[in-house]
Regions:
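Cap/lid segment of the alpha/beta-hydrolase catalytic domain
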Residues: 70-72, 112-179, 225-226, 233, ...
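Substrate-gating cap/lid region and adjacent catalytic-acid/histidine neighborhood
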Residues: 275-392, 398, 402-414
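A catalytic-pocket lid/entrance helix-loop region that shapes and gates access to the active site
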Residues: 199-201, 206-301, 421, 435-451
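Catalytic-loop region of hydrolases
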Residues: 32-105, 120-121, 251, 264-269, ...
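Glycine-rich nucleophile elbow surrounding the catalytic serine of serine-hydrolase chemistry
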Residues: 189-199
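Alpha/beta-hydrolase fold nucleophile elbow
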Residues: 180-191
Length: 519
């Protein structure tokens, strides 16, 4: 658990009085004045309905199973807490977990994809670390893939309203339950959750003291457009279709050609900008397949000549979504943009449809570089992206960071905003080599939960003590045992092997500017 820090105001004086009395009596854990968990059922907060408020006492383990993207519907908790569920306004379902042993911090957690579920995995992670933690379905349930059709209000909830309302009302419930407000608020999310974090930074800078946003992209329509275009090209020329084995062979060929450029042959392209990979060199592809692959893996361009989304990094293992299931990329245009159930993806046009989507659903293009309101509050932002992310182009996050630097200058930007490119990592977590630094979608406990190894601990240290992170030590584990470590460097630095010692030890690596880093 992180150490308690003092906050100002009358609530702080009350807290100090209680702690002082407990110290005199020999008690070891602060006790907060609070109402009972069941009393929260009667909480009177405008536009908030509390449906359940139950005490959870693991004996010794409490398990919850649910269906959600990437296993985020499952949870295991070993600490006692008050589990609150309810609805904000009409459709924004949320849960707030309030630990008995509270560290006076609030953690809002994001979702993934187009949301529609409660992120129980990250709730469990937060409450186990002493945070009062909240998650929302963002105003709809993913059991209905057509949730946006006929409901433009749900799109607004999904984009930004639900995140903001969850933060505002969770803070009210926390203060009511504990008799004291959280002294700091943090947000952590990846993919769709990263988009939510960036919308909080850009639209509601006061909501969170620190935001950790992974693989946020900058354009949800840009992400969906790549998948839609893949299907359109296959419809237009079935002979050009690429199967999963073809995409895998393309990624493997890129790695074979560029792996050793960084001096270490380990299956990782540390500096994709230095890799001059030609898809045509992939064995076994027909000319039609080569052109198809170039259109999908390269910059997403329209007929107007404009690039609407960057290329994927060489080595990223691309895969498409099925045409049925919880999330269907084409619905980003048919349902979201045009509110047309009969929209046919055969008519898809990159320039027209991506532009229309970003205009109709502006919150899914998170490109506002005016972060001064967030900076002036002394709030902090950490973003990260996998070097081999097959969903969100690594370059998209780099381009956004560079755009903020162009606007504010490097010293001012670095005073509150850091980007980390995780070599070898895919989408949000996993991949090749050491990629675990405590990020969501992983929530493993094999790494130390300190600021050197854990992104959330580092954010707390930056916000509350002013010590900014310049690198993390990431780990790779097998059967719960760490088998390799390596630094993750603040952009534009990249990991560099010294040439001596064990390549699997971070002690033999440093963060270095390699000259031709992605810009």
């Amino acid at each position: 658990m992180f150490p308690l820090t003092r906050c100002s105001g009358s609530g702080n004086r009350r807290f100090i009085t209680v702690v002082f009395a407990l110290l005199l009596s020999g008690a070891s854990t602060p006790v907060f004045a609070k109402i009972s968990c069941a009393d929260l059922l009667h909480a009177q907060i405008p536009d908030v309905r509390i449906d359940t408020a139950e005490e959870i006492h693991p004996a010794p383990l409490w398990k919850f199973s649910g269906n959600a993207l990437g296993g985020l519907g499952a949870a295991e908790v070993r600490v006692p807490f008050c589990r609150v569920s309810g609805v904000i306004e009409q459709e924004i379902a949320f849960e707030l977990w309030l630990p008995d042993d509270w560290d006076q911090r609030y953690l809002g957690v994001g979702n993934g994809g187009d949301a529609g579920f409660i992120n129980y995995s990250s709730l469990a992670y937060g409450v186990s670390r002493g945070f009062a933690s909240a998650s929302s379905n963002l105003g709809h349930w993913r059991s209905d893939p057509h949730w946006a059709l006929g409901h433009p209000d749900r799109l607004e909830n999904f984009e930004w309203r639900a995140h903001h309302l969850m933060a505002v009302n969770s803070k009210k419930l926390i203060a009511l339950y504990y008799g004291s407000p959280a002294h700091h608020a943090y947000y952590e999310g990846c993919s769709g959750g990263g988009m939510g974090g960036m919308n909080e930074v850009q639209r509601f800078p006061a909501d969170y003291d620190g935001v950790i946003a992974g693989a946020s992209g900058t354009s949800f329509p840009g992400i969906a457009a790549r998948w839609v275009l893949d299907k359109v090209l296959t419809q237009q020329d079935p002979a050009s279709e690429l199967k999963p084995d073809d995409w895998k062979r393309i990624a493997e060929t890129a790695i074979q050609q560029c792996d050793a450029l960084d001096g270490v042959k380990d299956g990782i392209i540390i500096n994709p900008a230095a890799c001059k990979f030609d898809i045509a060199s992939t064995p076994g592809l027909t000319p039609a397949q080569v052109q198809h692959a170039k259109a999908i893996l390269g910059p997403l361009a329209g007929r107007d000549g404009r690039t609407y989304f960057p290329a994927l990094s060489p080595g990223a293992l691309y895969s498409n979504f099925p045409e049925q299931g919880a999330f269907i990329p084409a619905l980003s245009f048919g349902d979201w943009t045009y509110q047309d159930p009969n929209w046919n993806l055969a008519n898809f046009d990159v320039a027209r449809d991506v532009s229309a989507a970003e205009a109709v659903v502006p919150g899914v293009r998170i490109w506002d570089t005016d972060l001064v309101p967030f900076e002036r509050l002394n709030h902090k932002l950490i973003t990260y992206i996998g070097g081999e992310d097959p969903t969100v182009p690594t370059q998209a996050n780099i381009d956004y960071y560079n755009a903020v630097v162009d606007r504010l200058g490097k010293p001012e930007t670095d005073s509150f905003f850091r980007l980390f490119v995780v070599s070898g990592m895919g989408h949000c977590a996993g991949g090749t080599g050491p990629t675990d630094f405590g990020q969501p979608y992983l929530n493993e406990e094999s790494h130390p939960q300190d600021a050197e190894h854990d992104v959330l601990a580092a954010m707390i240290l930056w916000v509350e003590e002013g010590r900014a992170p310049s690198q993390f030590i990431a780990s790779q584990s097998e059967a719960g045992k760490v088998i390799a470590t390596r630094p993750i460097c603040a952009y534009p630095m990249l990991p560099h092997f010294s040439g001596n010692g064990d390549v699997n030890s971070a002690a033999n690596w440093s963060c270095t500017y390699l000259g031709e880093a992605q810009k």
